[in-house]
Amino acid sequence: FATIGNKKSAGTKLVCLDSFFNNPGVYEIDMGTPMKKIFNEIGGGYKEPVKAFQVGGPLGGVVPLSEIDNLNLDFQEFTAKGFMLGHASVVSIPKDFSMSEYIHHLFEFSAEESCGKCFPGRLGSYRGKEMFDQAKKGTAKIPLKLLNELLVTMQKGCLCALCGAIPTPIMNILKYFGDEMKNDMMKDN
């Protein structure tokens, strides 16, 4: 098993490709395989245009399409680039899907699933969802500085992996899709 894959991440990994791929399914793939090969050759490309992928479930990183050519199926490589490989399921985000809506969904998920034991998880998830609720309704813009402080507090202060890791995909979206979301954001002084 250790001879399969690469030195950093040995063995194989089950990778689940969603229905946006021409060849959706679960594949056992050698660690170290280029993501480009997994998506284009094994997955057969995409049925419709996509702009990003959430890899590794709701706590996994959101990887823009432009970064796929630069990644291999490797835990350390994903982490070094600010993503998380996790269990390697791949959820495609369509080109026309709002990233503000996607972040709202992530906060909604963590607010619903939080155990409620710690303040950063219980209140942070709810406050994040509330910020995006108001932006959706058009009643308020999201204060970017406050959002970033909330995400750092959740990363550092949450007791469980759920609420402590949910900032990773949100930070990925803010980094790679910030321009798309500028109408929902309020720059702080």
Each model region followed by its residue ranges:
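Redox cofactor-anchoring modules in respiratory/redox and cofactor-processing assemblies
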Residues: 1-189
